[in-house]
C-alpha cells in the first residue's frame, strides 16, 4: 500500500506533523490528497523558537512535511489492509501486432538522398 493511500484513511484523527523547517503542527486531519497535501482543523502550530499559534483550519503542502506523529491508540492493522483488489494487467493476445515494427509503407518516404 502506498503511504499516501494510508494517510488518506486518517480522517478525524488527531496527529502531530513536523515540517521541514522545524515547525510542529498538532491538529485533527480533515483530509489528505494524492499529493500528500494535508488539511487540518483545531490546529496548534508551534513555530521553531516562537510561541504556539492556535488556528481553526490549516492546509499544509505535502512536500513541506517531514513526518507524521500518529497517536498510540491508532489501530494500524485495520488501516493497512488494502480494501481495493489489484487489477492484473491483461496479457497480449497472440497473433496481434504489437508495437511499431515493420510499418514503413506510409507517406512519400525520405527520397533517394539528393
Curated annotation (Swiss-Prot):
Belongs to the snRNP core protein family. This is Small nuclear ribonucleoprotein SmD1a. Residues 2-74 form the Sm domain. It comes from Arabidopsis thaliana (Mouse-ear cress). SMART domains: Sm. GO terms for molecular function: RNA binding. InterPro entries: LSm4/Sm_D1/D3, LSM_dom_sf, Sm, Sm_D1, Sm_dom_euk/arc. Residues 87-114 are annotated as: Disordered. Residues 99-114 are annotated as: 8 X 2 AA tandem repeats of G-R.
